[in-house]
Structure formats: structure tokens, C-alpha cells
Amino acid sequence: MGNLTSTCLFSSRENTAAKINDSSTWYPQQGQHISIQTFRELNRLPTSRRTSTKTEILLYGENSRSTVEVLEEVAKHLTTLQQRR
């Protein structure tokens, strides 16, 4: 397994208690194999139940895309999810 690379984004609106936590973790494998897990958690109110959306992208083999291409797709997917809400 390669080195762990991780990123986390936190955002909140001024006029609401809603908080969005986005985090992505990926493990570059030997031979450019990539595993990416992306999680989004949305808490509407501090006392509300947690609503969680999990997106997982697993790429293996010679036809795998580059790390940059995969990260761009994950960022695009997270942006699309945020716009739908």
C-alpha cells in the first residue's frame, strides 16, 4: 500500500446551524492503482440525526486514470451534490 493522502473540507452557512463536512482519503497503490473513498456528512441541527452520504470510487488495472483525473472527478461530484441540496 502506498502513502496515505487525505484532505478535509468544512463549510457552514452564517444564518443556519447546518454544517457540511467533506473528506476524501486515498491510497496510491503500486503500478498507479488508486483507491478513493469520499464521505459527506450533513448535520442540519445540532440535535438532529446524522444524514450521511458515502461515495466510493475504486479503480484498478492498466486502464486506471491518473490521480489528478480521479481527484477532479471527486471534486466535481461533491460540488454537484452540494448544488442539489
From Swiss-Prot:
The cross-references to InterPro entries, in alphabetical order and at most eight, read: Gemini_C4
In this UniProt entry, which residues carry a covalently attached lipid of the kind N-myristoyl glycine?
G2
Q: How does it sit in the membrane?
A: Lipid-anchor
Q: How is it modified after translation?
A: Phosphorylated by Arabidopsis thaliana ASK7/ASK-eta mainly on threonine and serine residues.
Please give the annotated consequence of changing R44P. Enhanced pathogenicity on N.benthamiana
**Cellular location of this protein?**
Host cell membrane
GO cellular component terms, alphabetically, are: host cell plasma membrane; membrane
Which keywords fit this entry according to its UniProt record? Host cell membrane, Host membrane, Host-virus interaction, Lipoprotein, Membrane, Myristate, Phosphoprotein
| Impact noted for substituting L45A | Enhanced pathogenicity on N.benthamiana
Q: How does it assemble?
A: Interacts with Arabidopsis thaliana ASK7/ASK-eta and ASK6/ASK-zeta proteins.
The job of this chain, per UniProt, is described as: Pathogenicity determinant. May act as a suppressor of RNA-mediated gene silencing, also known as post-transcriptional gene silencing (PTGS), a mechanism of plant viral defense that limits the accumulation of viral RNAs. May repress the AL61 promoter.
Q: Which family does it belong to?
A: Belongs to the geminiviridae protein AC4/C4 family.
Q: What is this protein called?
A: Protein AC4
**Species, as recorded:** Tomato golden mosaic virus (strain Yellow vein) (TGMV)
